[in-house]
Structures are given as C-alpha cells and as structure tokens.
Amino acid sequence: MPEIKTVPQEEAENRLPEGIEKIERFAVEVPQLTLPSGTAGKAPLPEGLFPMSVGCSLAFSSERTDGTLLFYGLTDRGPTLPAPSVRDGSGALRPARYFLSPMFQPRIVRIEVTAGKARSLSPVALTNAEAKPFSGLPARADDGAKPFAILSLANEELSGSLRPIDPEGLAIDPESAFWVVDRYGPALRQFSRQGVEREVLFPGAGLPAFLAARPGSLRSLSRLADGRLVTFDRNALGLTRFLTVIAVEPKTKASQAYLWPVEPGIWKRGTRPFIGDAAALGDGRLLVIEQGTARDAP
C-alpha cells in the first residue's frame, strides 16, 4: 500500500509544499442568476438572485505564455435548502428538500486567473446527446438511498427530472472533452467542450457493479497520466476505517476498487470524512481534500 500523508487544515495552511514559495487566494467573480418568478423574498435571497457557484470541483488546464492560469470549474445541482418533513399518502413523514431553482441546468465554467483576479467565463450548460438539457432535480424522490420530497419555495411538491444529474467531480480529457462524476447515477459522463454528452459509464458497464446498490456515494474525479479516471465512494463496504477508491480505464471499461485508509486520530470518534475533491499530481499520486468533524471539535 502506498504511503499516505495526512495534514490537518491548520498545518496545511501554514506549510508550503516543497518548491512552492507562496500561495495566493482569489475570490472568483461569477454571474448572478435569477430565481423563478414569484419566489423572491421567500428565500434567504430576498432580491431573487443567487451566485452561480463554480467550486463544486476544479481542474487545472494550462498556463498561457502571458502567465494567465486556466482552470475549469463545475457547478453542483443548483441551490437547495433543508425543508420541513412532509406526509406522504399513507400519512408517514418523510424528509424534504427545497430546490430554489428547479430548472437549474448544471454547467462547466472556464476560470481565468490573471492580473490578480479570477474570473469565470463562458459557462457551458450540460445536455444529453440529443441536446436536451440536464437538470439538477433527482430522477425520483430519493437522495442516495433515503426517500425525500422535492419542494419548491412555494411548498409545492415537484416531480423528478427525466434527465437528472448531480455533478460532484470534473476531469479534463485531452481529447477535447470533460468527464463528470454524477452522484445520482451513480455514473461517469463524458461531455464535449460544448457540453453535449458523448458517453456514460454505469455500474456493470464501466463502473464496478456493486455501485448499483450505493446511489449517491461518488465524490470527486481525477485523471491520471495513464488515462485512468479516479473517483471516491464515500462508503467502503461496511468498513468504518476506509473509503473506497474506484479507478476506471474509459477505453477498455476495466475498473479496479481500492481501499483508502481514514486516519482515526484526526476525526471525531464515530465519524468519517467526506471527500471534498482530489487532484492527480503525477507519479500515481493524488492530492485529496478530506472534510469532516475534527477530533477535538465540540
């Protein structure tokens, strides 16, 4: 098993990696999107606007000759909020979630960092192969394996989407394409630079078959130098001290599953971290952001 080094956030913020002289932080300039008519004032966004969040995943693309850094960012399924439980037809209570913008179409966004600023440019909305838009709404009333009601801000229950996607990771394919991990599937979806779906890998057809019983579990996406795509399963077959890493060869559809050990001394007893994102560093190495409740947290 390769050596895994875990660095707490406080230490990571104050310690620079070898060869790095400084770290700069940028607030990305993003456009404001409009909530559906009639919902302004009913949300925590009284003006009826919300920023297009492009930080669900981030992938480095290139550096231009003038020093401009080019990244690609990914939105998630759109703005949501917890909602009060609702009763179904049998009178049983089930959890609910507000979808503030039910027609939201997830996007891939180019981000340029230059002259001390980071700007989001040229958002590309995701569509299926017939150019019909994907939606951030679930296909059915579930969030992973747990049923929940989909509500508008007017407390009206919404039907699921015919083309659902919940983007949770982005990787750049050098053949003018992107790969996106879809938590709803779970699936890996390939898109053209114009945002049109080219290919999709599902459990049993490019992804390990056991993932079919674990919807809602995939997080992050990286592309290794050998072309394999790497994503994380937030669960690990019942093993509390491990997460699962899935590696997929897109051309042959071969896949492997590995165990990623969780440092027990860092996280609060009885909890495990989520994977925020991961980036390939070369030589088979991954830089992974783990998010969780610290051991000494109140």
What label would you give each PLM region?
Residues 1-298:
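Sequence/structural signature of beta-propeller domains
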